Amino acid sequence: MTLEQTLAIIKPDAVERNLIGNIISRLEDKGFQIIAMKMLHLNQEQAEGFYTEHSDKAFFAELIRYMTSAPIVVLVLQKENAVKDYRTFMGTTNPEIAENGTLRYEFAINQTQNSVHGSDSLENAQREIAYFFAEAEIYAR
């Protein structure tokens, strides 16, 4: 049994609508272990650093405005196949076509305000986790 870790973010729209507990409960119900968690309010520099791979895309400025508009909750999730399983559970970016039962189907407002983020690969998960957490803040079981 090989456990993986992935980064999850509960985005500003979900935080502002008091969905943190609901999302965490659903994660635990799906077998994800939360091994690190914190709430923070990103400044522009932090948001741009995190989303640097999107800096040349048309939606970048809107994404940065959104991600700095209110607090977020960042979590490190652990389970077998964590990256793939969490991405499946999140649903597609566009909530209008997200599958029933996914987080984005249930909670997203639109493609930008889509409630949650998840790492798209193991390599990116490692980079994203390190962006927000020191090793001493992660309590792997």
From Swiss-Prot:
One Pfam family, short name: NDK
Database matches in Gene3D superfamilies: Nucleoside diphosphate kinase-like domain
Organism of origin: Histophilus somni (strain 129Pt) (Haemophilus somnus)
Binding residue positions for ATP: 11, 59, 87, 93, 104, 114
Name the UniProt record assigns to this protein: Nucleoside diphosphate kinase
Domain of life: Bacteria
Enzyme class: transferase
HAMAP family assigned to the protein according to its UniProt record, in alphabetical order: NDP_kinase (MF_00451)
Reaction catalyzed: a 2'-deoxyribonucleoside 5'-diphosphate + ATP = a 2'-deoxyribonucleoside 5'-triphosphate + ADP; a ribonucleoside 5'-diphosphate + ATP = a ribonucleoside 5'-triphosphate + ADP
Location of this chain's protein in the cell: Cytoplasm
Gene name in the database record: ndk
Cofactor: Mg(2+)
Subunit field text: Homotetramer.
Catalytic residues (UniProt): 117 (pros-phosphohistidine intermediate)
Enzyme Commission number(s): 2.7.4.6
Function field: Major role in the synthesis of nucleoside triphosphates other than ATP. The ATP gamma phosphate is transferred to the NDP beta phosphate via a ping-pong mechanism, using a phosphorylated active-site intermediate.
